[in-house]
Regions:
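Feature of multi-pass inner-membrane transport and sensor proteins
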Residues: 16, 35-37, 160, 203-204, ...
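Transmembrane alpha-helical segments of polytopic membrane transport and secretion proteins
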Residues: 1-53, 124, 294-330, 568-578
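Glycine-rich helix-loop "coupling/hinge" segments at transmembrane-helix boundaries
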Residues: 245-271, 519-548
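Polytopic alpha-helical membrane proteins, predominantly small-molecule transporters/carriers
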Residues: 91, 214-215, 223, 363
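The alpha-helix within a helix-turn-helix
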Residues: 210, 483
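Membrane-water interface segments at the C-terminal ends of transmembrane alpha-helices
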Residues: 44-75, 85-200, 228-248, 276-295, ...
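A short amphipathic helical element positioned immediately N-terminal to and/or at the very start
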Residues: 35, 39, 77-83, 344, ...
């Protein structure tokens, strides 16, 4: 009987093994296809976020795909000319800027952060926040102020020749060292702010333990504070280098050739949009290398999450105290006080006579672009923040991360890629459809405000997403759940519960985007519609002609507007420490 049952048992075993294998294969397929399957098994309330996030991520990926496709057709004659005359200098200048600005912002930002956060000296309390004010000055404004001041025909050298004779001559300000110094003074606040926050957040017990063990302030800084602050310092240096690579206005003032100026000259000199896109892809590659290097240098370090403290650990006295005060005052004067005073002088001498109808038009154009870009960008960032909160699936998280990559794209790269994509759409879709419908058959997307607003959206969506995500994270899930239990849902839930709580973060995000759009030069210069000039474009036109005094009026306007988010940043920082 047992022998008779053996075939049946073997059949059952084989079937069970086959079923087990099928079950394993099914589980493996579910694990490997989660991003595709999760949409179908998600709750309907979560499923609606997928198409929105995918569309937003696609808008950010559009410039990247266009840059890759631009290599399908290469103009050998133009590239031969560029390689023989431009590329070696572009690569050398870019490497020089990366090394010089990277070292400079690190030394300057870390030294100032250490002094103002851990040391006590005369003037520390107001220098602590005053050193953040250079955030308000665009790089191209500080560049033309320094060139106008220190050039051979400027007031400084003219005065020195009157005092010491005609033979006295300072080193050329329009040099590699000059542009590096200006970019260091503009971008050191990134390192200063993040390093200062990291130093303040470090545990007081560690530093006191180092003092008990006989470590000097320098040894405690080098062995304890600096390694703990390395992630924050690395992030600040990466931001400074990204802004350096994306800069167009400052290097144009100094006649210093970089990839951004080469993109502009290729576009308007050779009239080759595809070659400009290929140069933009090389610039983007350099940006990615910088970001990868920052991540590798940071390693597995973790920033401290302790509460910031407000009391200094080291009380400087005598010459060291006044040396610390003098160093901080010198940086503050060079980066903010002297440039602003010189702008005021130029405004009174010449700039005030430009207060006419044309300047009113510049203000209106600038305000329109800033307000529209802020509304669109904040709205899209709200969608991403809510999608991340309501449907925290792998696909949504990946889509939100992709959508936030736009800030790493320089404005010139975005301009070239979007214009190339819109040129293709006009040629292959808009013009044929318009002609078929009996229209004029003219391009509608190329050179339109929609293209410029799309560039602003892609570049500054990260700026808006950060404050909104932080504000949304502070809202406890119990609040909307209680509102739903009372019958409040849909749009009423958003306007009655979420919006009042998100209002401070929303206003902060809108203000940050508004100010960044006002100061954005390369994307606005390359993509603006014909006759649609802004304050940044006006500054570029005047500085290109050496009209420093006439550029003072729009420059002062941008500086005053740029002070608004900086003041808010200072207030939040003071509130956290107190």
């Amino acid at each position: 009987m047992i022998r008779a049952a053996e075939p049946l048992l073997s059949t059952l075993k084989q079937g069970r093994c086959a079923a087990y294998r099928r079950l394993c294969l099914r589980r493996h397929s579910l694990r490997t296809t989660v991003p595709f399957r999760e949409f179908f098994v998600a709750h309907p309330a979560q499923r609606r976020w997928y198409p929105l996030v995918c569309v937003i991520a696609a808008l950010v990926l559009l410039p990247l795909s266009v840059l890759l496709l631009s290599w399908q057709s290469i103009d050998g004659q133009i590239w031969s000319h560029l390689w023989d005359t431009q590329m070696p200098r572009l690569l050398a200048n870019t490497l020089t800027l990366i090394v010089g600005v990277g070292i400079g912002v690190t030394l300057l930002g870390v030294s100032l952060a250490w002094l103002t956060s851990l040391c006590e000296f005369p003037g520390r309390r107001w220098l602590d926040w005053a050193l953040m004010l250079p955030f308000a000055i665009p790089a191209y404004v500080l560049a033309f102020v320094f060139v106008g001041l220190l050039d051979f025909a400027g007031p400084v050298q003219t005065l020195l020749r009157e005092w010491f004779g005609m033979g006295l001559r300072l080193p050329r300000v329009r040099s590699t060292g000059g542009v590096i110094i200006v970019l260091i003074l503009v971008f050191y606040p990134y390192v200063y702010l993040l390093a200062r926050t990291a130093f303040l957040a470090q545990g007081k017990g560690l530093m006191e333990a180092a003092r008990v063990l006989g470590q000097s302030p320098w040894q405690a800084f080098w062995r304890v504070a600096l390694p703990m602050a390395r992630p924050a310092i690395g992030a600040g240096v990466a931001l400074a280098l990204m802004e350096t690579l994306a800069d167009f206005g400052a290097v144009s003032v100094f006649n210093f050739d970089t990839f951004t100026t080469a993109i502009y000259k290729t576009w308007y000199g050779f009239f080759s949009l595809s070659t400009a896109a290929q140069l933009a892809s090389l610039l983007l590659l350099v940006v990615m290398v910088v970001l990868y290097g920052e991540r590798r240098a940071r390693g597995a370090s973790r920033a401290s999450n302790e509460r910031p403290r407000g009391k200094a650990l080291y009380h400087l006295s005598g010459p060291m105290a006044w040396l610390a005060s003098g160093w901080c005052l010198l940086v503050f004067a060079c980066a903010f006080v002297i440039p602003v005073l010189q702008l005021v002088v130029w405004f009174w001498q010449r700039g005030r006579f430009d207060l006419d109808e044309r300047y009113t038009g510049l203000i209106l154009h600038t305000l329109y672009l800033g307000i529209m870009a802020a509304l669109i960008t904040v709205s899209v960032a709200l969608v991403l923040a809510f999608a991340r909160r309501q449907a925290p699936t792998p696909t949504i998280r990946a889509g939100v991360s992709l959508a936030n990559l736009g800030y790493a794209l320089p404005g010139s790269v975005l301009a070239v890629s979007i214009m190339l994509a819109f040129s293709y759409l006009d040629r292959e879709l808009v013009i044929p459809v318009s002609s078929w419908l009996g229209g004029a058959g003219k391009p509608l997307l190329l050179g339109s405000l929609s293209a410029l607003l799309l560039a602003y959206l892609v570049r500054f969506i990260t700026v808006a997403y950060g404050p909104l995500e932080n504000s949304l994270a502070r809202i406890r899930p119990s609040l909307p759940e209680a509102a739903r239990s009372l019958g409040v849902s849909g749009p009423r839930l958003f306007f009655k519960v979420y919006l009042p709580l998100l209002l401070p973060g929303t206003l902060s995000a809108a203000l940050l985007v508004f100010v960044d759009v006002l100061k954005e030069m390369p994307a606005t210069l390359l993509m603006r519609p014909f006759g649609w000039d802004t304050l940044a474009v006006r500054i570029f036109e005047m500085t290109s002609e050496g009209e420093w005094a006439r550029a003072s009026l729009p420059a002062l306007t941008l500086v005053l507007v740029g002070l608004l988010p900086v003041i808010g940043l200072i207030r939040r920082s003071a509130h956290r420490i107190s």
